[in-house]
Regions:
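Bacterial Sec-dependent N-terminal signal peptides
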Residues: 1-23
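Low-complexity, acidic/polar, glycine-enriched regions of mature
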Residues: 20-181
Length: 181
């Protein structure tokens, strides 16, 4: 009898812990590096792995560089080349961060919340600290998060000829969207 009660208590506790950690393999990261010279440098990766711990505010993203899709295959080839993203040597971009105003985000109550996020963004093997905001919407037990920010390519040692020629923005806009169920 005691072992049955203990098993039930442990099962309930593990469900509660599991419910605090949300994951997805279909988050999206899009970037727009268009300039007045070239409107083509836009890409999207719809297979980003993301995790959110609603108890601690910990949030992580991992994106395979080769999974960014461009409208023009030639641009995708340049993007992955050694003189640009060098995706053979740096196959992933990652973000490890925290919601710093977690007390203002109620994951158990429907609504839209503004989250302050800080963390480390690693691209091209270079880690930089970033701060941004995210819009978090809770509805029907689903958590949707969206964030938009810019990065400086030179901060990540991305200096392809397209950047110096003005064909690619030196500060592309990054948009991250994720749905945690």
């Amino acid at each position: 009898m005691k072992s049955t009660i203990l098993s039930v208590v442990l099962a309930i506790a593990s469900i509660a812990v599991f419910a605090q950690k949300k994951t997805t393999t279909s988050a999206t990261i899009a970037f727009d590096a268009t300039t007045s010279i070239d409107a083509l440098p836009k890409a999207e990766n719809k297979t980003v792995v993301a995790a959110l711990d609603t108890k601690t505010g910990s949030i992580q993203f991992e994106a395979a560089i080769k999974s960014f899709a461009f409208s023009n295959p030639r641009i995708q080839q340049h993007f992955n080349a050694a003189n640009w993203m060098d995706s053979d040597n740096f196959p992933k971009a990652t973000f490890n961060g925290t919601i710093t105003n977690l007390a203002k985000v109620n994951f158990s109550k429907e609504g839209t919340y503004t989250a302050d996020v800080e963390g480390a963004l690693t691209i091209h093997g270079v880690e930089q600290k970033i701060k941004t905001t995210a819009a978090i919407t809770v509805k029907g037990g689903v958590i949707n998060a969206t964030s938009e920010f810019s990065i400086k390519l030179e901060d990540y040692k991305v200096n392809g000829a397209q950047v110096t020629s003005g064909k690619v923005s030196k500060e592309p806009k990054i948009t991250v969207t994720s749905e945690f169920k």
